Amino acid sequence: MVNFNQFLKQAQSMQKKMQEAQEQMANARYTGKAGGGLVEVIATGKGEVEKISIDESLLKAEEKEMLEDLIKVAFNDAQQKCDEDSQNSLSGALNGMRLPPGFKMPF
């Protein structure tokens, strides 16, 4: 028979680890790049864009469409890095239990 007090302690420990992982993710920054670094997007762990850097060579009217595409690619790159880190952080808090694909941290 499982010791109920031990079970509660484990649940509280897991909850604390999850809260710590969420705080760590919220404070993390992820840099996405596109076009060999011509466009960089820095996003927070909450998915908010903090900064966009654009190489001056792309600031021409004829480069508008390519610039729009590169910004999108750079943002998606940063978001993918955030998602991977989120999976790893939460999995660590859950003692190695893998999460289902597409599961997001609750924030």
UniProtKB/Swiss-Prot annotation:
Keyword Cytoplasm set for record: yes
UniProt entry keywords in alphabetical sequence: Cytoplasm, DNA-binding
Pfam family, one: YbaB_DNA_bd
Superkingdom field: Bacteria
InterPro entries according to UniProt: YbaB-like_sf (IPR036894), YbaB/EbfC (IPR004401)
Annotated localization: Cytoplasm, Nucleoid
Keyword Cytoplasm: yes
GO CC annotations on file: bacterial nucleoid; cytosol
One GO MF term attached to the UniProt entry: DNA binding
Transmembrane regions: none
Major place of residence: cytoplasm
Oligomer and partners: Homodimer.
Family, similarity comment: Belongs to the YbaB/EbfC family.
Known role: Binds to DNA and alters its conformation. May be involved in regulation of gene expression, nucleoid organization and DNA protection.
Listed NCBIfam families: DNA_YbaB_EbfC
Protein name: Nucleoid-associated protein RAF_ORF1224
Organism taxonomic ancestry: Bacteria, Pseudomonadati, Pseudomonadota, Alphaproteobacteria, Rickettsiales
